[in-house]
């Protein structure tokens, strides 16, 4: 059963990252990124299993229902790698706000214009990322580190929502309110 979007409302509000949060995010990410393929696949499989409507944007595997089959999909694995590389670029650039803005702008534009992805899925994906990383890396994802990640993902969601608004995304008022 799909969860309600209210479960990720904490991703609606962001504030600038502190220096301490930047360091915690970068340190924790270094551990996660060592297993980026497995982590990325776990995140996308969880997204598609818990939120099956998110598969509508992926013609290559939207028909696959079984989690094990999803894990084996080469197309899913490729997209998981792209997601993890985008997060890696973001995390590596946390000291450069222009680079962060550029990355988020490019991701937002590509998903709005080319892929026509409803922006609510960025909030949903962010919640899934927090959930999977917390389960897979419990020693790394302490409450304090998870809070820093929540703030980073809120920044991501707010920035991408702003890109969609700038582009005049037609469904924005219905999807992320």
From Swiss-Prot:
Keywords (A to Z) from UniProt: Cytoplasm, Heme, Iron, Metal-binding, Nucleus, Oxidoreductase
E.C. number(s) listed in UniProt: 1.14.12.-, 1.7.-.-, 1.11.1.-, 1.15.1.1
InterPro entries (alphabetical): Globin, Globin-like_sf, Globin/Proto, Globin_lamprey/hagfish
Domain named Globin: residues: 16-165
Residue numbers binding heme b: 79, 111
Coiled coil: none
MF GO annotations: heme binding; iron ion binding; nitric oxide dioxygenase activity, heme protein as donor; nitrite reductase activity; oxidoreductase activity; oxygen binding; superoxide dismutase activity
Cystines in this chain: none
Gene Ontology cellular component list: cytoplasm; nucleus
SUPFAM superfamilies registered for this protein in UniProt: Globin-like (SSF46458)
Compartment list: Cytoplasm; Nucleus
Catalytically driven reaction(s): Fe(II)-heme b-[protein] + nitric oxide + O2 = Fe(III)-heme b-[protein] + nitrate; Fe(III)-heme b-[protein] + nitric oxide + H2O = Fe(II)-heme b-[protein] + nitrite + 2 H(+); 2 superoxide + 2 H(+) = H2O2 + O2; H2O2 + AH2 = A + 2 H2O
GO biological process, one term: oxygen transport
Role according to the record: Probable multifunctional globin with a hexacoordinated heme iron required for the catalysis of various reactions depending on redox condition of the cell as well as oxygen availability. Has a nitric oxide dioxygenase (NOD) activity and is most probably involved in cell-mediated and oxygen-dependent nitric oxide consumption. Under normoxic conditions functions as a nitric oxide dioxygenase (NOD) but under hypoxic conditions the globin may switch its function to that of a nitrite (NO2) reductase (NiR), generating nitric oxide.
Family listed: Belongs to the globin family.
Classification via PANTHER family: CYTOGLOBIN (PTHR46783), CYTOGLOBIN-1-RELATED (PTHR46783:SF1)
Oligomeric form and interacting partners: Monomeric.
Name of the protein: Cytoglobin-1
Organism: Oryzias latipes
Gene for this chain: cygb1
């Amino acid at each position: 059963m799909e969860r309600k979007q209210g479960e990720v409302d904490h991703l609606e509000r962001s504030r600038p990252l502190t220096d301490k949060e930047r360091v915690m995010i970068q340190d924790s990410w270094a551990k996660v990124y060592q297993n980026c393929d497995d982590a990325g696949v776990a995140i996308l499989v969880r997204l598609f299993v818990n939120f099956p409507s998110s598969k509508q944007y992926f013609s290559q595997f939207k028909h696959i229902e079984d989690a094990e089959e999803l894990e084996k999909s080469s197309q899913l694995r490729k997209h998981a790698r792209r997601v993890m590389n985008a997060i890696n670029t973001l995390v590596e650039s946390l000291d450069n706000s222009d680079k962060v803005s550029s990355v988020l702008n490019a991701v937002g534009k590509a998903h709005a214009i080319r892929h026509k992805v409803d922006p609510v899925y960025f909030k949903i994906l962010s919640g899934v990322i927090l959930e999977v990383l917390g389960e897979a890396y419990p020693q790394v994802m302490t409450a304090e580190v998870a809070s820093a990640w929540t703030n980073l993902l809120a920044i991501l969601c707010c920035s991408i929502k702003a890109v969609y608004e700038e582009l005049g995304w037609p469904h924005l008022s219905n999807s992320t309110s």
